[in-house]
């Protein structure tokens, strides 16, 4: 109920603050949002690999990276991990991972991350390997070093408040300049599956801040698109690069939202008679699945309504598979067979139509997005050089 109320408030705020001005391409704010979903992150990883390949082709630049084109990249849970991988700099100040490196990452590390701990009372997985590999990959990099604005969510169980890690908020909240590996583990620490994460940050004046964090989906549901849009709104208002934008209109937003798949209509459904026999643990697992699916649907519905109301429906693309079945519905099945199935899901999704009313496939829509992103980047660079 509280989540729905928050959505409605943000929805009407968006409608109230938009205007009818036409957006210039170079003034558009570009946003990438990536859902949570555990090992199902393989699905958006396939989409990201295709999009980055298209950007490299359009710009004739094999070194082009997603972070070069998006003003804001946001993610929750496994989406937060993907966000960090494509925005964390290497020694050459370029993203340490190309999009094509993400699927191999899941295949190499997924079976070790989702290795049952054997605990009956504690979480299903101890999280030690996950934290170790995040430390190895992300090193000592902190939020302020990200190559573009990020929006990664978590929830503090001690203060009972959401925690949103962004670059643009560091001036007001320097304690949020945490290490990326701490942030990534925290946003992925789904209750039941992984232990909560405790860490401490220190500001330049010596102040000490303590965090006790769990999965970002607790704070922002599995689809962080609304969060990413709100961060983009603030960025457009505060960043000098967008000084020409006097009043933000959602016609000036270009949003790509990537899902990790939901169950088909006839899979994972239950009857009242069946559910009446469930115990607390079975209910907790089912409620998490139901809540994530419902919240993802409602987020897409709200955002679609806003963009349509502003006659900007082509500025929003939601890429989601709505017919997962069998093992592909599980967020923690990291068997090689299931990961291969998830790769197939992502590749097949590219060939599917965006909607029943449009013959355009996701592949074609992403090519269109790539062209827009490329053109905007060139216009922005040309404007900056004069």
UniProtKB/Swiss-Prot annotation:
Quote the subcellular location field of this record. Vacuole
Q: What class of enzyme is it?
A: hydrolase
**Which residues of this chain are annotated as glycosylation sites?**
115, 325
Q: Where is this motif: GXGXXG?
A: 36-41
Q: Which domain of life is it from?
A: Eukaryota
Q: Which InterPro entries match?
A: Acyl_Trfase/lysoPLipase (IPR016035), PNPLA_dom (IPR002641)
Q: Which residues form the signal peptide?
A: 1-23
Motif DGA/G, residue range(s) on this chain: 215-217
Provide one Gene Ontology cellular component: vacuole
Any one Gene Ontology biological process term? defense response
Any idea what job this protein has? Lipolytic acyl hydrolase (LAH), an activity which is thought to be involved in the response of tubers to pathogens. Can use p-nitrophenyl esters as substrates with highest activity on p-nitrophenyl caprate (C10). Also active on mono-acylglycolphosphocholines and diacylphospholipids, with highest specific activities observed were obtained with the synthetic phospholipids diC8PCho and diC9PCho. Mono-olein and myverol can also be hydrolyzed.
In the record, the note on similarity to other proteins reads: Belongs to the patatin family.
Q: Can you name this protein? A: Patatin-B2
Which organism was this protein described from?
A: Solanum tuberosum (Potato)
């Amino acid at each position: 109920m509280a989540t729905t109320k928050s959505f409605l408030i943000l929805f009407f705020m968006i409608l109230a603050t938009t205007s009818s001005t036409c957006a210039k391409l170079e003034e558009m704010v570009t946003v990438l949002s990536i859902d949570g979903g555990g090992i199902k992150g393989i699905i958006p990883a396939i989409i990201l690999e295709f999009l980055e390949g298209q950007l490299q082709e359009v710009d004739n630049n094999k070194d082009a990276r997603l972070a070069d084109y998006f003003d804001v990249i946001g993610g929750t849970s496994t989406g937060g991990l993907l966000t960090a991988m494509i925005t964390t700099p290497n020694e050459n100040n370029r993203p340490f991972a190309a999009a094509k490196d993400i699927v191999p990452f899941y295949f190499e590390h997924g079976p070790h991350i989702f290795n049952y701990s054997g605990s009956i009372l504690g979480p299903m997985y101890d999280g030690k390997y996950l934290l170790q590999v995040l430390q190895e990959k992300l090193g000592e990099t902190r939020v302020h070093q990200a190559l573009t604005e990020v929006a990664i969510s978590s929830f503090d169980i001690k203060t009972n408040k959401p925690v949103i890690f962004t670059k643009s908020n560091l001036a007001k909240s320097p304690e949020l300049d945490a290490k990326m590996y701490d942030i990534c583990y925290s946003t992925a620490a789904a209750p039941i599956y992984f232990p909560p994460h405790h860490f401490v940050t220190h500001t330049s004046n010596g102040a000490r801040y303590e965090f006790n964090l769990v999965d970002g989906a607790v704070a922002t549901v599995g689809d962080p698109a609304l969060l990413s849009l709100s961060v983009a709104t603030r960025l457009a208002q505060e960043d000098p690069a967008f000084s020409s934008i006097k009043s933000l209109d959602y016609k000036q937003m270009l949003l790509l939202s990537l899902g990790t798949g939901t169950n088909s209509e006839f899979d994972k459904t239950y009857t009242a008679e069946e559910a009446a026999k469930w115990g607390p643990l079975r209910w907790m697992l089912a409620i998490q699945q139901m809540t994530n699916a419902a919240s993802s649907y409602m987020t897409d519905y709200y955002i679609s309504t806003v963009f349509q109301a502003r006659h900007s429906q082509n500025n929003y693309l939601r890429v989601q598979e709505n017919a997962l079945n069998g093992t592909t519905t599980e967020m923690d099945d990291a068997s090689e067979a299931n990961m291969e199935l998830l790769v197939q899901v992502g590749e097949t999704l590219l060939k599917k139509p965006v909607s029943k009313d449009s013959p355009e496939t996701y592949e074609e829509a992403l090519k269109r997005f790539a062209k827009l992103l490329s053109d905007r980047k060139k216009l922005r660079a040309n404007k900056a050089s004069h």
